[in-house]
From Swiss-Prot:
GO cellular component: cytoplasm
Origin organism lineage: Bacteria, Bacillati, Bacillota, Clostridia, Peptostreptococcales
NCBIfam families associated with the record: apt, PRK02304.1-2, PRK02304.1-3, PRK02304.1-5
Entry keyword set: Cytoplasm, Glycosyltransferase, Purine salvage, Transferase
Organism: Alkaliphilus oremlandii (strain OhILAs) (Clostridium oremlandii (strain OhILAs))
Key word Glycosyltransferase present: yes
Record field: catalytic activity: AMP + diphosphate = 5-phospho-alpha-D-ribose 1-diphosphate + adenine
Intracellular or extracellular location(s): Cytoplasm
Name used for this protein in its record: Adenine phosphoribosyltransferase
Matching InterPro entries: Ade_phspho_trans (IPR005764), PRibTrfase_dom (IPR000836), PRTase-like (IPR029057), UPRTase/APRTase (IPR050054)
Recorded family membership: Belongs to the purine/pyrimidine phosphoribosyltransferase family.
Amino acid sequence: MDLKSKIRQIEGFPKEGISFKDITTVLKEGEALQYVTDQLTEQLKDLNIDIIVGPEARGFLVGTPVAYKLGVGFVPVRKPGKLPAETLTYEYELEYGTDSLQIHKDSIRPGQRVAIVDDLLATGGTVLATAKMVEALGGQVVSMNFLIELTGLKGRDILKGYEIKSLVEYEF
């Protein structure tokens, strides 16, 4: 399948100079959604994954069906104040300021083999924060898998040491 033909690009969204990669066009088409799920599952099937972790919000949409196909659970990583039980918070740097993410403290058991699945790898900040929380809880991040990678933003550079795979690459 020509997956790039299924991803809508919107120029100037959310601001001028950005070419937004809209995956709702993939999600609404059953064949494309199955293809993405099958391809991500194929990347992970031999890694003995115990659990999938997905960052808010599109990581939920991509990661949950992969977890289902692998027969493992799914753990959401959310913005602060969105998870009801005791959480671990990780604050990370943005170009101008900081942001933070949270995960339930009881969501990862020590020694669990974790795959982080998300829709997009850009600068790598969100997925690195996610990995740091998983590791703080004792999990082992064995793979990071993405539908889209924006290679020009060099997210891989801050993720050295992690296994990274993506289905589609764009420069920006």
